[in-house]
Amino acid sequence: MKTQMNYAKEGVFTKEMQIVAQKENLSKDFLLENIACGKIIIPANINHKSLDPNGIGFGLRTKVNVNLGVSNDCVDYSEEMKKVELAHKFDIEAIMDLSNYGKTSRFRDELVNVSKAMIGTVPVYDAVGFLEKDLKQIGAKDFLDVVYHHAKSGVDFMTIHAGINSRAAHIFKQSKRLTNIVSRGGSVLYAWMMMKDAENPFFEYYDDLLDICLKYDVTLSLGDALRPGSTHDASDGAQISELIELSLLTQRAWDVGVQVMIEGPGHMAINEIEVNMQLEKRLCKGAPFYVLGPLVTDIGAGYDHISGAIGGAVAAASGADMLCYVTPAEHLRLPNLEDVREGIVATKIAAHAGDIAKLPKERARDDEMSKARQEIDWEKMFKLAIDGEKAKKMFNERRPDDLNSCSMCGKMCAMNTMNQILKGEDVSLA
């Protein structure tokens, strides 16, 4: 089976590439060149028939991913499907099913069947439930069986923590971290490696993993098991050593035509974000960077969507290609529907803010909003807002008598004052 990368290397412009070119207003040659060298990916499993393809990477708009899925404390698949509907409503490009309890295949199959967004999973989360074995009883190649099952089901990308090999684990042991390993999948693999005194199975059998990805054109999202879970731990030796391992694994994947993106931090002080984005691009030769925030402070519990949006905007402006959303429930509980909505909007704002910095053409919508505000065209403002539904609701909650203003300024509305005086009309505030 040929992947999007293989086709690009041969100069074949696939239907998925055509769709992305139209969405992003990019030339055929630009896309082919950058997909062929790994700087742009189009995650598109051959079995995901409902997919509306999107590209991730150099010269493209920053994409947003929404996490959802059940846990052993909250098993309500109907609520998770409502989260999917909400993600579709906001035109989210990627959805990850992070279910980590029970038999997850039925929900995943339904997700692939109905979702136009690219679907991602973390197969190691599913290992115990799928294999019906406790962690210590799982064999190295058993993990590949889970990967194969996910790939065959139609998921477009998978988080695989192949970089936490014995070398990276040794460096981690010497680190003086406050929060150790905060990656759920990374902690499971590290525990397995320690209990079995064995190499990371995804690293040991990486070539077999690539064969599975090739068969279904699954994009590898190389997970950062050693990402910092606190600002104290950011940019330490453990994080960077794993990134170096991921850079080597990226080249091995590219050599056979498997598409790759790199996952990144995490928690990180705002002044460290730009250099971390540059470091990933340098080490991984421009591979798309998918960051989890980053959260710029550790004390925002209940408001971590704000911390994540601040970091995400800086990351996107500095080269990050996809942002994983963060909700107000982060670090506290499984998010509900309102949490998901708040997380989506905050992250879309961050992504767009970053795009304004790196893609000048993305300012057009903001300019239209500014014109609508000057013209006091409320319906146009609601239409242009990222969450126009909330904007309209808030306006109507204290709807003014005079629609040439809002209830904040009334007759002292600066826009209305200037519109009148510049037309030569008298301004009355009485």
From Swiss-Prot:
A single GO BP: thiamine biosynthetic process
Any GO MF annotation of the entry: 4 iron, 4 sulfur cluster binding
Catalytic reactions of this protein: 5-amino-1-(5-phospho-beta-D-ribosyl)imidazole + S-adenosyl-L-methionine = 4-amino-2-methyl-5-(phosphooxymethyl)pyrimidine + CO + 5'-deoxyadenosine + formate + L-methionine + 3 H(+)
Cofactors required: [4Fe-4S] cluster
InterPro entries: ThiC (IPR037509), ThiC/Bza_core_dom (IPR038521), ThiC/BzaA/B (IPR002817)
Highest taxon of source: Bacteria
Enzyme Commission number(s) from the entry: 4.1.99.17
Keyword Lyase tagged: yes
Residues that hold Zn(2+) according to the record: 267, 331
Binding positions for substrate per the UniProt entry: 67, 96, 125, 161, 183-185, 224-227, 263, 290
Cofactor note text: Binds 1 [4Fe-4S] cluster per subunit. The cluster is coordinated with 3 cysteines and an exchangeable S-adenosyl-L-methionine.
Binding-site positions, [4Fe-4S] cluster: 406, 409, 413
Gene Ontology CC terms: cytosol
Keyword Ribonucleoprotein: no
Subunit and partners: Homodimer.
Main function: Catalyzes the synthesis of the hydroxymethylpyrimidine phosphate (HMP-P) moiety of thiamine from aminoimidazole ribotide (AIR) in a radical S-adenosyl-L-methionine (SAM)-dependent reaction.
Protein name: Phosphomethylpyrimidine synthase
Source species taxonomy: Bacteria, Pseudomonadati, Campylobacterota, Epsilonproteobacteria, Campylobacterales
